[in-house]
């Protein structure tokens, strides 16, 4: 599918690995998952990507590019207080920036369209970071930027999108990029706006297409716990773990499960209405 590459917002159905430079790693994967869901008839929570093009425009129209570059050049990465102070300054500058009228209208149109799809006024959404430098071969950016859950109403969506933009410069992200010698020019951020799902009656987790500890690429590793996935991602709970053999997944007579290990799952995070 041909995409207009100057678009500020792209729905999940039009996201793919082909426009990863616009929508980042997470949104491109969500787009691929959306396409797969249409073929195999399963559901995913729908949404849209606010692209790196809109992020660039936001930074430039608020005259922040020079401030960002000058600040990054003078950070003392051997001084944690210095990193924190400069991080806070950049986060404050970005979160206090303003969207143009056309940007606000564009985001509102797609948010309202999502509300209409699910027939819910002021639909609860997750505001999720999707950086273009996510999961490089020699580096992983999982958890570096921020995610905001259960965001309701267009004004709150706009504010949390700015916070997501700003999280590109939080202390852990700055320190990690410096340790990996990744220049800021290599990193931009897209933002996923995605419908929230029920967490009180379900579970969440992560799946890896290889063993993240050993690098063994013939296995799939799945970790899952009750409620939202935050505790799994942050290591705050011991999840269930299942390891599958890729070679036997398509053999209906074979058991693909190599190992199952039950975690204590001692707590869960749910949305308190």
Stretch-by-stretch model annotation:
Residues 148-152, 207-210, 243-245:
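Short beta-strand-to-turn element immediately C-terminal to the catalytic PLP-Schiff-base lysine
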Residues 219-273:
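Conserved catalytic alpha/beta cores of large enzymes that bind or transform nucleotide phosphates
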């Amino acid at each position: 599918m041909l995409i207009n590459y100057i678009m500020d917002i792209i729905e999940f159905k039009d996201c793919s690995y082909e426009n990863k430079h616009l929508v980042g790693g997470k949104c491109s994967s969500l787009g691929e998952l959306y396409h797969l869901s249409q073929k195999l008839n399963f559901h995913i929570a729908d949404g849209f990507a606010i692209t790196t093009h809109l992020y660039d425009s936001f930074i430039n129209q608020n005259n922040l590019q020079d401030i960002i570059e000058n600040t990054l050049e003078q950070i003392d990465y051997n001084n944690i207080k210095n990193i924190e102070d400069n991080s806070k300054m950049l986060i404050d500058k970005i979160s206090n920036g303003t969207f143009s009228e056309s940007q606000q209208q564009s985001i509102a149109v797609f948010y309202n369209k999502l509300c209409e799809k699910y027939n819910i006024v002021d639909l609860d959404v997750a505001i999720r970071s999707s950086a273009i430098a996510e999961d490089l071969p020699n580096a992983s950016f999982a958890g570096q930027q921020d995610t905001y859950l259960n965001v309701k109403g267009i004004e709150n969506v706009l504010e949390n999108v700015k916070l997501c933009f700003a999280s590109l410069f939080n202390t852990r992200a700055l320190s990690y990029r410096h340790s990996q010698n990744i220049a800021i020019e290599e990193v931009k951020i897209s933002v996923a706006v995605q419908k929230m799902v029920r967490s009180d009656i379900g579970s969440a987790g992560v799946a890896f297409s290889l063993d993240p500890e050993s690098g063994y690429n013939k296995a799939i590793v799945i970790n899952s716990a009750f409620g939202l996935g935050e505790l799994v991602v942050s290591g705050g709970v011991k999840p269930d773990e299942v390891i599958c053999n890729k070679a036997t997944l398509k053999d209906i007579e074979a058991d693909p499960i190599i190992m199952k290990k039950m975690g204590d799952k001692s707590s869960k995070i749910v949305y308190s209405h």
